[in-house]
Amino acid sequence: MFRGATLVNLDSKGRLAVPTRYREGLIENAAGQLVCTIDIHHPCLLLYPLPEWEVIEQKLSRLSSMNPVERRVQRLLLGHASECQMDNAGRLLIAPVLRQHAGLTKEVMLVGQFNKFELWDETTWYQRVKEDIDAEQSATGELSERLQDLSL
C-alpha cells in the first residue's frame, strides 16, 4: 500500500528516484516493473506496479470498443501506458509525452494512493490540495453513505 506525498526531482533525462521506503516492495511484488499512464480527469500521471496495472488492463479489455465513451477511455489509458523499469539506482524514466501531459519539469510530487502513485507537478499539486480543502470547507451537500461511515 502506498501512502503519503513526497517531493522528488526529475533529472535532465526525465528520471525520478523512487523513495527508498517503496523500493523493496516494488522489487519483491513487481520485479521493479511499473506502468505509467495519464489520469483522464486531472493533470497528473498514474503509476502502477505491473501486477496492479494488469488488473486494470483486464477491466479495460472487457469494455466495448463499439461504445464511444468506453472506447475513449481505453484509447486514453492504454494509448498512453508506458512500461517503466526501475533501474539499479531505484530510478524510473518517465516518457516525455507523459511528462508533458502532467506539466512535469523538475520538482514532482509522488503521491501514494493505495495501489498506485499519482505524479503531480509540485505547484499544481499544492493548488489542487488548496482547492480540495476549500471545497470541503464550503460543502453544504449531503455526504454519500460511504463517507458517512468513514470516521476519522
From Swiss-Prot:
The cross-references to InterPro entries, in alphabetical order and at most eight, read: MraZ (IPR003444), MraZ_C (IPR035644), MraZ_dom (IPR020603), MraZ_N (IPR035642), MraZ_sf (IPR038619), SpoVT-AbrB_dom (IPR007159), SpoVT-AbrB_sf (IPR037914)
**Which segments constitute the SpoVT-AbrB domain?**
5-52, 81-124
User: Is-annotated flag, keyword Cytoplasm?
Assistant: yes
Q: Which Pfam families match?
A: MraZ
Localization (cell): Cytoplasm, Nucleoid
Looking up Gene3D superfamilies in the UniProt record yields: Transcriptional regulator MraZ domain
Sample GO molecular function, one term: DNA-binding transcription factor activity
Ordered alphabetically, the record's keywords are: Cytoplasm, DNA-binding, Repeat, Repressor, Transcription, Transcription regulation
Any Gene Ontology biological process: negative regulation of DNA-templated transcription initiation
Cellular component (GO) terms are:
cytoplasm; nucleoid
Assembly description: Forms oligomers.
Q: What does this protein do?
A: Negatively regulates its own expression and that of the subsequent genes in the proximal part of the division and cell wall (dcw) gene cluster. Acts by binding directly to DNA. May also regulate the expression of genes outside the dcw cluster.
Q: Which family does it belong to?
A: Belongs to the MraZ family.
The protein in question is named Transcriptional regulator MraZ
**Organism expressing this protein natively:** Klebsiella pneumoniae subsp. pneumoniae (strain ATCC 700721 / MGH 78578)
Per the UniProt record, the lineage of the source organism begins with:
Bacteria, Pseudomonadati, Pseudomonadota, Gammaproteobacteria, Enterobacterales
